[in-house]
Amino acid sequence: MIRFDGQVAIVTGSGRGLGAAYARLLAERGASVIVHDAGVALDGTGFDPNVANAVVSEITTAGGSALPCYENIESQGGCQRLIETAISQFGRLDILINNAGWITFTPLEEMTPALLERIINIQIAAPFWLSQAAFPTMKQQHYGRIIFTTSGRAMFLEHALPELTGYALGKMAQLGLMNALAVAGAADGIRVNAISPVAATRMLQRAVAPQELRPEQVAPGVAFLASAQCDVSGIVLQASNSHFATAQWNVSAGIDAGEAVITPEAIADQWSIITGV
């Protein structure tokens, strides 16, 4: 049975939705969890500690171990303080789940510097700084699990939306970071993977049937990636409606012109072979 007894987890953005489901499941299976959430509104403004507090209360009432953290992780310092909170309160850090995100439905032509900066801070910089702060402790322990969050809206052309340019940027950047950290942490027992979830959260912004797209149907996949039983890195696990699959990239056989320098016309003539379709 997969358990997390004696382990410590941070789940960013875990006051609601997917993050809350992850935090509850990890705590139910023995982990001590830092429930991180500043309780901001959909537009990223405001502050409400009750959002994280409610999940902590739910966990502790059920007999689990959890503490809230309200740090603003849009800066390196905030990320460092979040990691330090887990270590100072529980003495170690085993699991980092980079779940916090932000969506702005803004086409390329309408993107502003302020909007792009916020996307970069939350979707790219925060996972980077949090991982940087967590790495020394995980290396010292010779154990760690880091999970990033990506999206089919970024990975696949057929699911892309023109108003999600910034969102797609952030979600693909996390996959590059996943691969680099998977190599960096391999010798020290640090495994790094990603989840690509679809769930009915406030960010989805569309109505679904009550029994569809529940965050609880995604959480088991994240729990596996966070466990000792998951001893691989570089996996992108797609999860929705209790359906789980891995997203994989393949390189076509292509053509090989040897030492010759071929023409663009030759590329055009053999395009179907190069693309494999």
Language-model region placement:
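A glycine-rich helix->loop->beta "capping" turn
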Residues: 4, 62-65, 78, 85-98, ...
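Active-site-adjacent segment of SDR/Rossmann-fold oxidoreductases
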Residues: 21-25, 29, 180-190, 228-231
